[in-house]
A protein has these predicted regions:
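Structural recognition of the beta-strand scaffold that forms the well-ordered cores
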Residues: 7, 38-40, 87-90, 117
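Residue-level preference for alpha-helix termini and adjacent loops
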Residues: 18, 38, 79, 92-94, ...
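Short N-terminal mixed-charge amphipathic segments
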Residues: 30-44
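Short, conserved, surface-exposed binding loops centered on an aromatic residue
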Residues: 28-31, 79-80
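Residues that flank catalytic or metal-binding motifs in active/ligand-binding sites
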Residues: 4, 35, 84
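Long, amphipathic alpha-helical surface segments
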Residues: 1-26, 43-48, 52-56, 60-61, ...
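Mid-chain, well-packed structural core segment of small domains
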Residues: 77-93, 98-101
Length: 145
């Protein structure tokens, strides 16, 4: 780390959640901002945001975490085709691992290789009613493999 980076980390502090730079309080829904939404070491999100490269780096970190969560929670999923693993990982990314695990019928069907039933279970859900196009694409991938 450069001398400047060390100095700024010390002076600004490292904050891993968005905070109001004027008050130091975390930014949460319903709280009025006084200053600027800031994260990391002084990164003002409303002034600079993040770059596409930074967004992709964050995404890759999130994907690695989701893959581990899915394999830890559903070890049998490692035997699925790559496309079907991607479906489960994408669902866990969107819904959280706890949300994915609520699809008990879908997961049981996928585990026994009944992909039509797994896809049907996906489509018969609140998730599918809330995000119908996405759910239809994911169900088609589950069916086709």
């Amino acid at each position: 780390m450069s001398a400047l980076a060390e100095l700024l980390a010390r002076e600004e502090g490292v904050r891993l959640l968005v905070y109001d730079d004027a008050t130091g309080r975390p930014v949460v829904p319903g709280v009025t901002m006084v200053g600027h939404p800031t994260i990391g070491i002084g990164r003002c999100l409303d002034r600079k945001g993040i770059t596409a490269g930074e967004a992709l780096a964050l995404l890759e970190n999130d994907i690695a975490e989701v893959r581990q969560q899915v394999l830890r929670s559903l070890p049998w999923a490692a035997r699925l085709s790559e496309a079907r693993q991607v479906v489960l990982q994408a669902m866990a990314f969107q819904l959280g691992i706890a949300g994915l695990l609520k699809f008990t019928g879908t997961l049981a069907a996928a585990q026994r290789s009944d992909y039509a039933a797994a896809a049907a279970g996906m489509l018969d859900s609140l998730w599918a009613r809330q995000t119908p196009a996405r759910a239809a694409r994911m169900a088609a991938m589950m069916r086709a493999g």
